Amino acid sequence: MTILFLTMVISYFGCMKAAPMKEANVRGQGSLAYPGVRTHGTLESVNGPKAGSRGLTSLADTFEHVIEELLDEDQKVRPSEENNKDADLYTSRVMLSSQVPLEPPLLFLLEEYKNYLDAANMSMRVRRHSDPTRRGELSVCDSISEWVTAADKKTAVDMSGGTVTVLEKVPVSKGQLKQYFYETKCNPMGYTKEGCRGIDKRHWNSQCRTTQSYVRALTMDSKKRIGWRFIRIDTSCVCTLTIKRGR
């Protein structure tokens, strides 16, 4: 699990700035940007065959340290929900890339890894009981998440309520990159398309509905003015209830 997650995190490092890291005491020579990462040769060729396993463990520990630093930084910069009603303006669901991203946004992976670390500190018995699948837990509404492009969205609604055109490509110093949006919406083919799961239909009318949040994207308004604006995209699937009358 840890190695798989580290592999996904490595693919993101080329698209983001490195977060401040504390110095790590890692053995070996030639370490540069990241402690424990070498620019030439393999772990076995430098310190012998037995050094490979030690180096792999050290590398895993180093990346765990980096991830913990990123989680700490995220907690510091994330606005308080009690003092900021526009907290979902800061969701990280937009990526500029030359190809379709293969994984969810990095912050989603960090949250999953944080939950994994919390579970790792539990006893085996507590861990089994904390696993939602073992407890038979199911989502109230079935949802799907996927990356979409501006070619799929075409237009969107900005914070002023106006309709703007979402630009498919963003100019950069070495060419152009496509805008990708990570959207979450209710699954039309799921088991909850006729109502929320676990709701007493004798007393309640229920419906799974897709809700939206604001993210920043490069757009063009009706006056052909191009700029970065906050637009609404699908970000979750929630259950809405209304009580049945006349019963």
From Swiss-Prot:
Which positions carry the propeptide annotation? 19-128
Summarize the PTM comment.
Mature BDNF is produced by proteolytic removal of the propeptide, catalyzed by a FURIN family member. In addition, the precursor form is proteolytically cleaved within the propeptide, but this is not an obligatory intermediate for the production of mature BDNF. Can be converted into mature BDNF by plasmin (PLG).
Q: Where is the signal peptide?
A: 1-18
Q: Site Cleavage: list residues.
A: T57, S58
Compartment(s) where it occurs, according to its Swiss-Prot or TrEMBL record: Secreted
Hydrolase as a keyword?
Answer: no
Listed under GO cellular component are:
axon; dendrite; extracellular space; synaptic vesicle
Q: Which pairs of positions does the record mark as disulfide bonds? A: C141-C208, C186-C237, C196-C239
> What GO molecular function annotations does the UniProt record carry, in alphabetical order?
growth factor activity; nerve growth factor receptor binding
Question: From what superkingdom does this record's organism come?
Answer: Eukaryota
Q: State the Gene Ontology BP annotations.
A: cell surface receptor protein tyrosine kinase signaling pathway; modulation of chemical synaptic transmission; negative regulation of neuron apoptotic process; nerve development; nerve growth factor signaling pathway; neuron projection morphogenesis
Question: InterPro entries of this UniProt entry?
Answer: Brain-der_neurotrophic_factor, Cystine-knot_cytokine, Nerve_growth_factor-like, Nerve_growth_factor-rel, Nerve_growth_factor_CS
Q: Which residues are glycosylated?
A: N121
Q: Does the keyword Cell membrane apply?
A: no
The regions listed as transmembrane in this protein's record are none
Provide this UniProt record's keywords sorted from A to Z.
Answer: Cleavage on pair of basic residues, Disulfide bond, Glycoprotein, Growth factor, Secreted, Signal
Subunit comment: Monomers and homodimers. Binds to NTRK2/TRKB. Can form heterodimers with other neurotrophin family members, such as NTF3 and NTF4 (in vitro), but the physiological relevance of this is not clear. BDNF precursor form: interacts with the heterodimer formed by NGFR and SORCS2. Mature BDNF has much lower affinity for the heterodimer formed by NGFR and SORCS2.
Q: Which family does it belong to?
A: Belongs to the NGF-beta family.
Q: Briefly, what is this protein's role?
A: Important signaling molecule that activates signaling cascades downstream of NTRK2. During development, promotes the survival and differentiation of selected neuronal populations of the peripheral and central nervous systems. Participates in axonal growth, pathfinding and in the modulation of dendritic growth and morphology. Major regulator of synaptic transmission and plasticity at adult synapses in many regions of the CNS.
The protein, known as: Neurotrophic factor BDNF precursor form
Species, as recorded:
Ursus arctos
